[in-house]
UniProtKB/Swiss-Prot annotation:
It is a multi-pass membrane protein. Signal peptide: none annotated. It comes from Bacillus cereus (strain AH820). PROSITE patterns: ATPASE_E1_E2. It catalyses: K(+)(out) + ATP + H2O = K(+)(in) + ADP + phosphate + H(+). The chain crosses the membrane at residues 55-75, 79-99, 245-265, 271-291, 605-625, 633-653, 677-697. The active site is at residue 324. This is Potassium-transporting ATPase ATP-binding subunit. ATP binds at residues 361, 365, 393-400, 412. HAMAP family: KdpB (MF_00285). Pfam families: E1-E2_ATPase, Hydrolase. The gene is kdpB. It is found in: Cell membrane.
């Protein structure tokens, strides 16, 4: 009897395995396509008009041209063999190609994301409601702002808009990747809809909020393709420093022959070019653009749309995070927290009747009561409740429960409503009911009274529960030197209780939306950078004021327009991950800059002795690596300089490992790993390459 079941299960497992294997194959195929495209682009980017945007690599390209010409038209006074010039020119060419490949690879990943987004932009038609009430079908490309459109079940939402009538379930998987549909309704903070999403139930009327080319998907495509990417202030500053270093070393190398002629010897042009390329920070110069693009790419993979690289960088410098209590720190729905018996009743009795009243209750509160009772190992008769008649909650009665087959009536609900119901049954009210109800209210909870016929057994303490792991996450932020401030409309006592439980640094009680702006400005006046999340129209001013404003995709258009980041999953806690990505971006750029500059130390000890030993024998003392010959030393330094770029591409794309700790601790750690490592690795690498090159010279 068991054999068919086993075979069926095996087949199911095999089909699942095949599906996973297909996904892996598709991912590998996409990666291969991206790499092939990047290789083609690395050659196309050799165009001087493109290269001049990266001054460091442009200098290397000019060096390639000079040495390539010298390969065919060598100087008459040159003592360098002809093969040396062509070898140097090829190494310089590949140095530029590797740098171009890094940038093209990062851009290619963005283009792949853009292509998948473009697939969601299908040719759809919209049912436009004219002023006279007539419904006309037009192409989505002909829609304009303020047009009114009716979207029915199974139809694609033609463009961005806001629901002005009706309620519907909308499948946003094309945008967010989340398969579960979300409810969109007129009014409130969940009225915003996005073009390219599908209505899966009911019917809604929306007003269009964007013209063609200005929709949410259009902006996403533009951003991930890099069309709207601008260099950030930090990136510009670093690029300026690196360009200045390049200019200084260029002046040094150009004027060097004057001094060598005075000393009675000449240095070949190819050697001078090699010296310049080894001195300038080519490693970080070749990876700088890729790091910035990859940082935007990492944010996008978290389903967060950053309006600019500046926003991602700002997230890395954040000092203070403003967080709403409801939905961010807490679940936002009330859950059973404690059972409080009254009079002479026991917790077991309260739990038993609370569970029976909730067996048929499908609300989140009802489910949480069952889970709480089961966690307390309190027994109850589930079948007894299932055989009874469920009494749903109504605004008029403010109670729910079940009428059992034997005539017993079980109720749970608001304190006043249940007390009146018990009195109508001829029952008496225990003295401590109101006392315990007041205690729950003062704690910020919601009291529900549990009664059976004319007898009150106790209360259920419903609490907006703090999300698991929040204390640990706030501790990580504290280690990073980031202060957390919780804003809530609760009274100070309740706010203090939740703040203590969650582990936030500060809280603002009885906070109104306009108070958030004051909190943000107060922090900014102290020189702090502030991040906050929001989804409502009333959050828009604060989102605009914050240095990093993360709006929820489920929120209003006003909130999304005010923010500089949008979370497609509408998860407010994701601001913590965004801060981590921002810090990782800054750390990656800083670490690779440190590594690149530290590399120069080893290159000095390789190329300087090689250049001057013949004329100044005392310079041999600097040849601490005992390199084979001057020509081998120069080629080894150049080869290492070229090869290190592709080796560091995965690190630039993925970002360096990030652990929450203070800025000083991070600085010390990165100086040790990438500063000291940047000195040691080239010594080893150049020596190994020299041994190999020495076999051929």
């Amino acid at each position: 009897m068991m054999r068919p079941v086993v075979v069926k299960e095996k087949r199911v497992n095999e089909s699942h395995i095949h599906a996973v294997e297909d996904e892996v194959r598709q991912a590998k195929t996409m990666d291969r396509d991206i790499v092939k495209h990047a290789m083609k682009q690395s050659v196309a980017k050799l165009n001087p008009k493109v290269m001049i945007k990266n001054p460091i690599m442009f200098v290397v390209e000019i060096g390639f041209v000079i040495t390539f010409i010298l390969s065919f038209f060598p100087s008459h006074s040159s003592s360098i063999p002809g093969w040396f010039n062509i070898t140097v020119s090829l190494i310089l060419l590949f140095t530029v190609l590797f740098a171009n490949f890094a940038e093209a690879l990062a851009e290619g990943r963005g283009k792949a994301q853009a292509d998948s987004l473009k697939q969601s932009k299908k040719d759809v038609f919209a049912n436009v409601v004219k002023e006279n009430g007539e419904i006309v079908q037009v192409s989505a490309t002909d829609l304009r702002k303020d047009d009114v459109v009716i979207v029915k079940q199974g139809e694609m939402i033609p463009s961005d808009g806001e629901v002005i009538k009706g309620l519907a379930s909308v499948d946003e998987s094309a945008i967010t990747g989340e398969s579960a549909p979300v409810i969109k309704e007129a009014g409130g903070d969940f009225c915003s809809v996005t073009g390219g999403t599908m209505v899966v139930s009911d019917e809604i009327t929306i007003v269009i909020t964007s013209n063609p080319g200005e929709s949410f998907i259009d902006k996403m495509i533009s951003l991930v393709e890099g069309a709207a990417r601008q260099k950030t202030p930090n990136e510009i500053a670093l690029n300026t420093v690196l360009t200045s270093l390049t200019l200084i070393f260029l002046i040094v190398v150009v004027t060097l022959p004057i001094f060598t002629n005075y000393l009675g010897f000449q240095i070949d042009t190819a050697v001078l070019v090699a010296l310049l390329v080894c001195l300038i920070p080519t490693t970080i110069g070749g990876l700088l653009s890729a790091i910035g693009i990859a940082g935007m790419d990492r944010v996008t993979k978290f389903n967060v749309l950053a309006m600019s690289g500046k926003a991602v960088e700002a997230a890395g410098d954040i000092n203070t995070i403003i967080l709403d209590k409801t939905g961010t720190i807490t679940f936002g729905n009330r859950m059973a927290h404690t059972l409080l018996p009254v009079g002479n009743e026991t917790i077991e009795q309260v739990g038993k009747w609370a569970a029976i009243s909730s067996v048929l209750d499908e609300t989140p509160e009802g489910r949480s009561v069952i889970e709480h009772v089961q966690a307390k190992s309190i027994s109850y008769n589930k079948e007894l409740a299932e055989q009874g008649e469920f009494i749903p909650f109504k605004a008029e009665t403010r109670m729910s429960g079940v009428d059992l087959q034997d005539g017993t009536k079980v109720r749970k609900g608001a304190v006043g409503s249940v007390i009146e119901w018990v009195k109508s049954q001829g029952g008496t009210i225990p003295k401590d009911v109101n006392q315990k109800a007041d205690f729950i209210s003062k704690e910020g909870g919601t009291p529900l009274v549990v009664a059976v016929d004319n007898r009150i057994y106790g209360l259920i303490y419903l609490k907006d529960t703090v999300k698991p792991g929040m204390r640990e996450r706030f501790e990580q932020l504290r280690q990073m030197g980031i202060k957390t401030v919780m804003c809530t409309g609760d009274n100070p006592l309740t706010a203090a209780t939740i703040a203590k439980e969650a582990g936030v640094d500060e809280f603002v009680a009885e906070c109104k939306p306009e108070d958030k702006i004051a909190v943000i400005k107060a922090e900014q006046d102290k020189g702090k950078l502030v991040a906050m999340t929001g989804d409502g129209t009333n959050d828009a001013p604060a989102l605009a004021q914050a240095d990093v404003g993360l709006a929820m995709n489920s929120g209003t258009t006003a909130a999304k327009e005010a923010a500089n980041m949008i979370d497609l999953d509408s998860n407010p806690t994701k601001i913590i991950e965004v801060v981590g990505i921002g810090k990782q971006l800054l750390m990656t750029r800083g670490a690779l800059t440190t590594f690149s500059i530290a590399n120069d130390i080893a290159k000095y000890f390789a190329i300087i002795p090689a250049m001057f030993t013949l004329a100044i024998p005392q310079m041999e003392a600097l040849n601490i690596m005992k390199l084979t010959s001057p020509l081998s030393a120069i080629l080894s330094a150049l080869l290492f300089n070229a090869v290190i770029i592709p080796l560091l591409i995965p690190l630039a794309m993925k970002g360096i490992a990030y652990k929450p700790m203070s800025s000083n601790a991070l600085l010390g750690r990165n100086l040790l790993i990438y500063g000291l490592g940047g000195v040691i690795v080239p010594f080893i690498g150049i020596k190994v390459i020299d041994i190999i090159v020495g076999l051929f010279i």
